[in-house]
């Protein structure tokens, strides 16, 4: 825990009736950012943005230091009301045993009319994959590939058009660089 008011900060957002889930700013032990929100479509399904930036850096247009809406946040530190969790069926543990169950949960919340908030004022250190391990065996790689296919089939429209990410930016990396070729086609002038 970095900020002792982390829970108060997260609960203050989660209690708002229009909010489905709240995520925190998570740091690696070397004080670089691990989680600053999730962007859909990056690397095929979703990825954390601002990964690796140093403490004190504002990120792309200040997004690493501003409370904002996202399509998803990590469940590594997630606060939500029980009624929100149960109303969308909770985590899909059958098809998403390890990866993307948090993204799936957040998308179900958005589909039900709720919003997802990320706050930089709830800060903690996160030891990524310490409990679940890495996808470094054939069995884990197969499971990971099945989870990717499931997400791409279920949420294909969302993964190509995240409303909280500029469509002029690439889905190949999480560095906010321009997409080339452009993801948006030229609009007719009529």
Predicted regions and their residues:
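A short, conserved alpha-helix in the catalytic core of glycosyltransferases
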Residues: 5-10, 64-89, 94-125
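Non-transmembrane alpha-helical segments in soluble domains
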Residues: 11, 37, 106-107, 148-152
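A general alpha-helical scaffold signature found inside nucleotide-binding enzyme cores
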Residues: 5, 17, 100, 104, ...
